[in-house]
Amino acid sequence: MRNDQREVNQLRNINITTNYISHPEGSVLIEMGNTKVICNASIEDRVPPFMRGQGKGWITAEYAMLPRATAQRNIRESSKGKVSGRTMEIQRLIGRALRSVVDLDQIGERTVWIDCDVIQADGGTRTASITGAFVAMSLAFAKLVEAKTLKKTPIQDYLAAISVGVLTNGTEILDLNYEEDSEAAVDMNIVMTGEGEFVEIQGTGEEATFTPNQLQNMLKLGEEGIQQLVKIQKELLADKLLID
């Protein structure tokens, strides 16, 4: 039994509130246990300079954390005048993941801006951001289809992400909270499509190693967790996302 009484293969309580903020084309609040992230998707009718003239779109992401999203106050990165390496890594991960399931040629020369703002952190903020951002992006594209700006959604598959890890006693677990993450011997983030294909796997031994068997067990746990997340996404987007 884990520190929050969950089973090793049990997700935290999940809630995704759609249309959380009124201004963006797509907006959700995703809650995974005590981790809470606002994910907004905004459509801009232009692309970055390196994409101009190609007739295709782009998806990019920004990620930030409120100063008191954590137990101790963090200084805003805007006050520091630069984005940390961790933040840059997470932003690129979110953007890469979302682009993997979208036909950018169908968007035309438009940019989808994804803004993920962590308002409360208890582990798994980057994976929650990807899962929530997919829903926000889907809602944004649905609005373009409703307005007849796009003929159909450019989304080709569902997308979700989850963390898995190995505790110091050798137990593989799903969806780590902050306490588990800070004490884990191995930490891994997995991004997968609704069809069960891997998009990204980030795994690190925290002053430890892991066996091929443990790797397979973690991948299996992650796949099972992501299937549950995709099921929730499908229920939310039943009348918004029609994938050919």
Curated annotation (Swiss-Prot):
Q: Which GO terms describe its molecular function?
A: 3'-5'-RNA exonuclease activity; tRNA binding; tRNA nucleotidyltransferase activity
Q: Which reaction does it catalyse?
A: tRNA(n+1) + phosphate = tRNA(n) + a ribonucleoside 5'-diphosphate
Protein's recorded name: Ribonuclease PH
Q: What is its EC number?
A: 2.7.7.56
Q: Which domain of life is it from?
A: Bacteria
* GO terms (BP aspect): rRNA catabolic process; rRNA processing; tRNA processing
| Main enzyme class | transferase
Please spell out the taxonomic lineage of the organism that makes this protein: Bacteria, Bacillati, Bacillota, Bacilli, Bacillales
Instruction: Provide this UniProt record's keywords sorted from A to Z.
Output: Nucleotidyltransferase, RNA-binding, rRNA processing, Transferase, tRNA processing, tRNA-binding
Q: How does it assemble?
A: Homohexameric ring arranged as a trimer of dimers.
Q: Which residues bind phosphate?
A: R86, G124, T125, R126
Q: Which gene encodes it?
A: rph
Q: Which InterPro entries match?
A: ExoRNase_PH_dom1, ExoRNase_PH_dom2, ExoRNase_PH_dom2_sf, PNPase/RNase_PH_dom_sf, Ribosomal_Su5_D2-typ_SF, RNase_PH, RNase_PH_bac-type, RNase_PH_CS
